């Protein structure tokens, strides 16, 4: 469909926001890149206007075009690339030239499977950067840096993504350790998607006395731990107490923080798979509101984007968001026969608002599933899952399923592929670009059949975090070389921000080395090149988002998203490649992250 141009008012508002915002960077870990720790995320303060022509010169710019061209200069105007090549560049009033001095530049990274809306709704003053820390000292440094812009009495939080395996000590910080870094603000650290959690002294005092209509105080251990006690998950209860105290302005701040973190790791566009919806919302609308039992990955799926959309209307969003619609209703006996199942999905499919929006925010597909996956061994749930595929195909929407298979079985993938073939025979889906997420153990036969249906896959890259070597030596997947050799459009994703971090360089490191977070080989013989990994995260992911004509490569006419890196991703050691960070991120022709490294290199 034809994209709507943002209004002039919103463009001016966004440019002003980007121009006047400020970023504080905290460097840690020696050669580690700067990590942004802002309350009002934007770019490093600057006096120059962002509305003219922007020219990058003297770089190694990997365009990721069809020829894998590497050029030295690129010109950006009005949000698009207007010149890509070598030699002369635009000069004169309104032209800003940035001398890259040989730095590596790549297209903006596109994330094809994330749950970014969760990161954009975190209560408190959130520290997403804790996923980049490698030990407890670095976590504490990040918390202390964040405290500088947190008002008295307000929580500092760090949730999701982080697990003890990411830290050298293989544990979360204790109450005493958190107190040593932040003694005068309550702190709440929440592990993964469902806890446990850890707090400090002020947080302990709050949670042990907190009351609300649906829950009383939390049980907090002497070390600040919130775990499951007598069947009650007190990490989730604590999360509930924070969520119900969030204001709409708090949520807008959280959405800005999430976008700033995304820009700081080089992600310029996300395909959001939303969150696991409450299945009972149709029967009990009150269950959509925050509950003491809700984990981090559950929010009201009708209202979770409200704050982000408000920012977009104000012209203040700066990461491209594509929203999928995840529907999570299995067989519900109270709804009756099959014709009355799936009420939410049926309502969604009455409209044709897929791939609808503008360059910064648009809708996507049904995904990452239309109904919870079920096999024929559960007849009622299988019937509902199969019917959900029929409904999506009949309505002419794009559809996704997320199945990885296992090292010893690809039966679940076979069920998805054979069902897609049945949908094509009945309705015709070849022009809809249906997708398979994860796809770790898709066989050559599966891939050939999916390719014949004009489907694509998005390969998972998160196994490195919790995977351990198998006793039989089999790879944990994905089988990257096999998937890429099939010729099917194959993107790559991290699947943040609960079971894995948001940082894409971790996934690229895993795809190219097979090493887990502890340095163990868990995917033997299944490595791809760095060029292939970057292609999957840029050009291939653009195809997966149905945006290959606008995104994924640095070519004249495409939207101007690029990342200037702090090191040469292609030549540094594997260990250093994993630490890759941007020094400058550009979205829509505007600098949205600036580590300050290039400040002295501007002509």
Language model: regions and residue ranges:
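Extracellular/periplasmic ectodomains of large secreted or surface enzymes and adhesion receptors
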Residues: 595-603
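Signal peptide processing junction and immediate N-terminal pro/mature segment
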Residues: 33-45
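His/Asp/Glu-enriched, well-ordered alpha-helical/loop segment
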Residues: 393-404, 408-434, 438-440, 444-455, ...
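N-terminal export leaders
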Residues: 13-30
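Divalent metal-binding segments
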Residues: 46-57, 62, 66-345, 359-405, ...
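Acidic (Asp/Glu)-rich catalytic clusters
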Residues: 312, 349-361, 450-452
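N-terminal secretory signal peptides
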Residues: 1-16, 38
């Amino acid at each position: 469909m034809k994209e709507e141009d943002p209004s002039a008012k919103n463009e001016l508002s966004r440019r002003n926001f980007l121009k006047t915002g400020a970023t504080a960077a905290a460097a840690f870990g020696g050669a580690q890149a700067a990590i942004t720790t802002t309350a009002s995320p934007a770019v490093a303060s600057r006096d120059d206007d962002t509305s003219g022509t922007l020219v990058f010169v003297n770089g190694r710019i990997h365009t990721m075009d069809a020829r894998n061209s590497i050029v030295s200069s690129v010109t950006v105007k009005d949000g698009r690339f207007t010149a890509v090549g070598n030699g002369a560049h635009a000069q004169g009033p309104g032209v800003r030239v940035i001398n890259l001095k040989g730095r590596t530049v790549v297209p903006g990274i596109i994330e094809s499977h994330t749950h970014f809306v969760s990161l954009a709704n975190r209560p408190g003053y959130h520290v997403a950067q804790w996923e980049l820390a490698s030990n407890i000292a670095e976590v504490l440094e990040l918390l202390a840096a964040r405290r500088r812009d947190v008002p008295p009495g307000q929580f500092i939080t760090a949730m999701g993504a982080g697990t003890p395996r990411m830290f050298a000590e293989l544990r979360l910080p204790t109450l005493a350790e958190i107190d040593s870094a932040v003694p005068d603000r309550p702190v709440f650290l929440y592990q993964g998607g469902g806890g446990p959690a850890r707090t400090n002294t002020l947080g302990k005092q709050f949670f042990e006395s907190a009351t609300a209509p649906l829950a009383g105080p939390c049980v907090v251990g002497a070390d600040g731990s919130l775990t499951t006690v007598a069947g009650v998950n007190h990490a989730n209860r604590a999360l509930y107490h924070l969520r119900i105290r969030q204001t709409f302005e708090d949520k807008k701040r959280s959405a800005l923080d999430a976008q700033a973190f995304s820009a700081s790791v080089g992600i310029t566009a996300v395909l959001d798979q939303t969150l696991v919806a409450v299945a009972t919302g149709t029967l009990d609308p009150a269950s959509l509101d925050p509950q003491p039992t809700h984990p981090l990955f559950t929010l009201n799926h009708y209202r979770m984007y409200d704050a982000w959309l408000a920012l977009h209307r104000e012209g203040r969003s700066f990461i491209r968001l594509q929203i999928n619609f995840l529907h999570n209703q299995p067989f519900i006996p109270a709804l009756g026969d099959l014709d009355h199942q799936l009420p939410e999905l049926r309502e969604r499919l009455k409209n044709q608002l897929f791939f609808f929006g503008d360059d910064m925010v648009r809708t996507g597909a049904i995904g990452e599933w239309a109904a919870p996956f079920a096999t024929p061994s559960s007849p009622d749930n299988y019937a509902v899952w199969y019917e959900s595929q029929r409904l999506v195909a009949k309505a002419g929407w794009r559809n996704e399923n997320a199945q990885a298979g296992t090292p010893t079985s690809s039966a679940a993938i076979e069920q998805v592929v054979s069902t897609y073939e049945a949908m094509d025979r009945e309705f015709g889906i070849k022009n809809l670009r249906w997708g398979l997420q994860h796809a770790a153990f898709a066989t050559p036969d599966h891939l050939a059949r999916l390719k014949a249906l004009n489907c694509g896959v998005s390969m998972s890259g998160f196994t490195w975090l919790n995977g351990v070597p198998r006793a039989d030596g089999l790879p944990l997947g994905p089988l990257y070389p096999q998937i890429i050799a099939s010729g099917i459009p194959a993107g790559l994703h991290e699947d943040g921000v609960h079971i894995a971090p948001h940082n894409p360089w971790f996934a690229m490191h895993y795809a190219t080395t097979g090493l887990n977070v502890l340095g163990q080989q868990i995917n033997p013989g299944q490595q791809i090149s760095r060029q292939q990994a970057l292609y999957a995260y840029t050009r291939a992911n653009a195809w997966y988002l149905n945006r290959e004509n606008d995104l994924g490569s640095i070519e004249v006419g495409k939207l101007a998203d690029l990342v200037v890196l702090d090191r040469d991703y292609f030549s540094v050691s594997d260990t250093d490649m994993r630490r890759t960070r941007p020094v400058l991120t550009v979205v829509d022709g505007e600098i949205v992250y600036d580590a300050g490294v290039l400040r002295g290199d501007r002509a």
